[in-house]
């Protein structure tokens, strides 16, 4: 009969050789003879675990321990339990192993590793150290000691431990990988890359080391090599969604959008429940301006991971770009609820609420953003925007000043400050000029102006190429005033090239485009490239139609891409740029004595600097409301921010002096309940009951114009009146009462009224303003007659004489051309002679 030891020896030999079937037969043969044979039970248990039956294998191993409780059996059972995910039970077996055999180095090492997994790094470190004490060349124990030290934050000691592991086993790939991890934690990316490369060389089929190497290469800026490494990772693990997310992220950041999209899409297919795959795809689609699909993907990501604040913030950005402002606000608020310290979400939420004219709601988020970082210039800017809409012009100005102090490099901050200074009721215009010049000095310092050829060779009668730079070639005051003029410019004298700075287009854009010989958007071009484009187009006169308003490109003008540069119509104060030669106005907005407000030289058109294009809607003037209502209706259609405290006080005096009179206010801000309440409270503080106010929000353009039929007389605010609204009011037969001013912006209403022959509707001061309003209200016959005559009067005035205006504008361009090119003072046109 075969001896027991022979059967066991043969079975073990088969087991070690991988012949598991033969080994199993041998163990079972032995157990048939000796059912409680501890080695047979134990090794059959190990084999059964290897064969994918862990529960049956663990049961056999427990029987072996019952038969013979050796330290080795406890250690091996611990390994089996750990592989099964039963960490606490495994730790108990390792502890029993070292209790039974205190000098059992392998059991101490395994216990240390398991304790680290159980987040007990101190205990882990002790047992790993004990294993090393028992076996000083134990590389695996050094590696596990390094892991414990890393978890304890002792990174320098961890580096030493991994180094010892590698010293004792130079082919220990895991130790190199772990060393790379701790070096990455220390931001020693060069050394980390070296360690990961060693790990990859030793274990070239291990995806983990490729992933870590790719991340370290990205961290130190080796993008191309990182992408190549991550491609190798995907080759090794094509079904690993995380690998594809990592590669997609690297490709996205490298600007390889199509390749990135392919990786994120494949990751989402492999693992549909991976939020980061959907979020990564959303982000790259958003960068490709596929915003609608990007929003769908980000929504899916948030369904899978609803606690991810940054994803809500980005989805808010997407909804904003899609014009879905309510949804955008909801997303930003969700982001701030998840993380009250998300300054970007607070800031962006405030900006969208402002676009919805919800200044009161915006105030909370603007203040929250600033509280999180009072040195964040954009947060100061946004709070300034909110306060301005709420009518707090001093608070608005203070925050704009602070924003510029914090970030002098941001031109938008300068724009806000200069605009606020120009329209503030009590700011000296020399301060506005200084702020504008501060901006000019900054942008001109970064520009290298183009040199232009000797002007003596330029002919005075050649066809001029005129460039028009604007973000407002839409239904906007600029577009409205420009439309009629372009149609009447002499195309034999002028060639027109548009340089839009905004992607926005509408019906007005469609009517404007045919008047241009070329349409060259500047949206994606930095200032220098935009200037080179204009220079390459051979522009003779470059016209700025924005000044310090939204989407301006004053930085382009600093490069002096055209020999003659002029600012017109879009703004009402100095740009601050010496590179802009002229500011175009008229004798009303640029009266003698106010030239010092500008860095640019004033150039005055003979009649008006504005040319009004009547609305295309076929609307009648309508009867005088006073006749039908029996009470006077004053009106103001414009931004509430123009209604400063002095304006509210004066208008309240008018209402108090005209019994039964009402004030019809129409503004986008009045779509909000809080704005309605706040406006009523402002008048109540001046003794005017809310019943005397009619307040309406935004309307479609035709409905907006129709609303003028409900007004007897418009009241223009001061010092920031309306230009477009004044002209529109006159066209609808409604006279406008204006206030004489002392700077360009305050003269705009004056210019319209003077040109329309309504100089007697300009008040000298507040008392005269009230007196004129009261007198007009007391003379319905005059109002009625004026109402039915105003449209014809306006249309017959130079304000609506587009051919006349176009000729003056052409002459101005030629006059500027001759003036700046020194072609001879005797060739200057008469219009230019009016400047001082």
Predicted regions: what they are:
Residues 1-630, 649, 681-688, 699-713, ...:
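Alpha-helical solenoid repeat scaffolds of the TPR/TPR-like class and their adjacent stem/linker regions
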Residues 466-468, 634, 663:
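Conserved hydrophobic helix-helix packing surfaces used for dimerization/oligomerization
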Residues 469, 637-638, 666, 696:
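Short hydrophobic "strand-cap" motifs at the C-terminus of beta-strands
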Residues 493-495, 652-681:
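A conserved nucleotide-sugar
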Residues 715, 729:
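Donor-sugar nucleotide-binding helix/loop cap in glycosyltransferases
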Residues 717-719:
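A short structural motif in glycosyltransferase catalytic domains
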Residues 730-731, 754:
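Short alpha-helix at the nucleotide-sugar/activated-sugar donor binding site of glycosyltransferases
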Residues 746-757, 762:
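Short acidic/histidine- and often glycine-rich active-site loop of Leloir-type glycosyltransferases
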């Amino acid at each position: 009969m075969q001896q027991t030891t022979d059967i066991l020896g043969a079975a073990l030999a088969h087991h070690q050789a991988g012949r598991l079937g033969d080994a199993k037969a041998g163990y079972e043969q032995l157990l048939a003879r000796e059912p409680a044979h501890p080695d047979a039970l134990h090794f059959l248990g190990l084999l059964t675990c290897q064969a994918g039956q862990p529960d049956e294998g663990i049961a056999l191993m427990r029987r072996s321990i019952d038969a013979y409780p050796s330290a080795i059996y406890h250690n091996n059972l611990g390994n089996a339990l750990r592989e099964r995910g039963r960490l606490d039970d495994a730790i108990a077996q390792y502890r029993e192993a070292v209790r039974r055999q205190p000098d059992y180095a392998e059991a101490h090492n395994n216990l240390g590793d398991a304790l680290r997994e159980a987040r007990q790094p101190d205990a882990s470190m002790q047992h790993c150290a004990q294993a090393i004490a028992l076996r000083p060349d134990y590389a695996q124990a050094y590696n596990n000691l390094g892991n414990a030290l890393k978890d304890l934050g002792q990174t320098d000691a961890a580096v030493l431990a991994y180094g010892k592991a590698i010293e004792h086993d130079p082919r220990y790939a895991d130790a190199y990988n772990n060393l790379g991890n701790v070096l990455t934690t220390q931001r020693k990316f060069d050394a980390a890359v070296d360690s990961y490369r060693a790990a990859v060389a030793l274990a070239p089929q291990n995806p983990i080391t490729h992933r870590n190497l790719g991340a370290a290469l990205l961290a130190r800026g080796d993008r191309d090599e990182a992408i190549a490494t991550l491609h190798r990772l995907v080759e090794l693990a094509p079904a690993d969604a995380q690998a594809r997310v990592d590669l997609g992220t690297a490709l996205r950041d490298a600007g390889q959008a199509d390749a990135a999209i392919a990786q994120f899409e494949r990751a989402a297919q492999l693992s549909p429940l991976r939020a980061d795959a959907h979020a990564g795809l959303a982000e790259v689609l958003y960068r490709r301006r596929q915003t609608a699909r990007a929003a769908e993907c980000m929504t899916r990501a948030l369904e899978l991971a609803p606690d991810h604040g940054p994803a809500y913030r980005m989805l808010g950005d997407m909804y904003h770009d899609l014009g879905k402002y309510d949804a955008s606000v909801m997303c930003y608020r969700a982001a701030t609820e998840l993380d009250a310290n998300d300054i970007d979400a607070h800031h962006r939420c405030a900006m969208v609420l402002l676009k919805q004219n919800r200044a009161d709601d915006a105030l909370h988020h603007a203040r929250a953003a600033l509280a999180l970082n009072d040195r964040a210039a954009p947060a100061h800017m946004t709070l300034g925007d909110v306060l301005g809409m709420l009518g707090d012009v001093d608070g608005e100005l203070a925050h704009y000043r602070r924003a510029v102090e914090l970030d002098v490099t941001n031109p938008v901050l300068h724009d806000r400050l200069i605009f606020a200074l120009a329209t503030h009721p009590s700011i000296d215009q020399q301060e506005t000029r200084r702020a504008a010049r501060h901006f000019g000095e900054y942008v001109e310092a970064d520009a290298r102006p183009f040199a232009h050829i000797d002007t003596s060779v330029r002919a005075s009668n050649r066809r001029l190429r005129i460039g028009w730079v604007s973000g407002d070639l839409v239904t906007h005051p600029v577009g409205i005033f420009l439309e009629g003029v372009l149609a009447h410019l002499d195309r034999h004298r002028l060639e027109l090239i548009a340089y839009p700075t905004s992607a926005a287009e509408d019906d007005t854009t469609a009517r404007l485009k045919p008047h241009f010989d070329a349409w060259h958007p500047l949206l994606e071009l930095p200032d220098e490239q935009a200037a080179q484009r204009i220079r390459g187009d051979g522009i003779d006169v470059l016209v700025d139609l924005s000044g310090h308003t939204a989407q301006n490109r004053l930085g382009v003008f600093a490069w002096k891409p055209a020999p003659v540069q002029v600012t017109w119509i879009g703004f009402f104060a100095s740009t601050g740029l010496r590179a802009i030669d002229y500011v175009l106005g008229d004798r009303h907005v640029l009266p003698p004595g106010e030239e010092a407000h500008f860095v640019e030289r004033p150039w005055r058109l003979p009649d008006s600097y504005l040319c009004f294009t009547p609305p295309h809607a076929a609307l009648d003037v309508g009867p005088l409301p006073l006749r039908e209502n029996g009470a006077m209706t004053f009106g103001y259609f414009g931004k509430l921010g123009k209604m400063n405290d002095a304006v509210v006080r004066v208008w309240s005096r008018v209402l108090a002096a005209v019994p039964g009179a009402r004030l019809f206010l129409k503004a986008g801000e009045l779509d909000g309940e809080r704005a309605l309440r706040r406006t009523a409270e402002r008048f109540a503080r001046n003794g005017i009951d809310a019943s005397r106010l009619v307040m309406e929000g935004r309307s479609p353009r035709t409905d907006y114009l129709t609303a003028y039929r409900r007004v007897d007389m418009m009241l223009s605010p001061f010092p920031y009146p309306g230009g477009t609204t004044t002209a529109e009011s006159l066209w609808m037969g409604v006279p406008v009462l204006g206030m004489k001013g002392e700077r360009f912006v305050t003269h705009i209403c004056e210019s319209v009224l003077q040109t329309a022959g309504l100089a007697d509707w300009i008040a000298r001061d507040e008392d005269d303003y009230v007196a004129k309003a009261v007198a007009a209200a007391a003379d319905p016959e005059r109002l009625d007659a004026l109402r039915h005559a105003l449209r014809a009067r306006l249309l017959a005035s130079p304000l609506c004489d587009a051919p006349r205006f176009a000729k003056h504008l052409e002459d101005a361009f030629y006059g500027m051309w001759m003036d700046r090119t020194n072609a001879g003072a005797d060739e200057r046109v008469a219009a230019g002679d009016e400047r001082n």
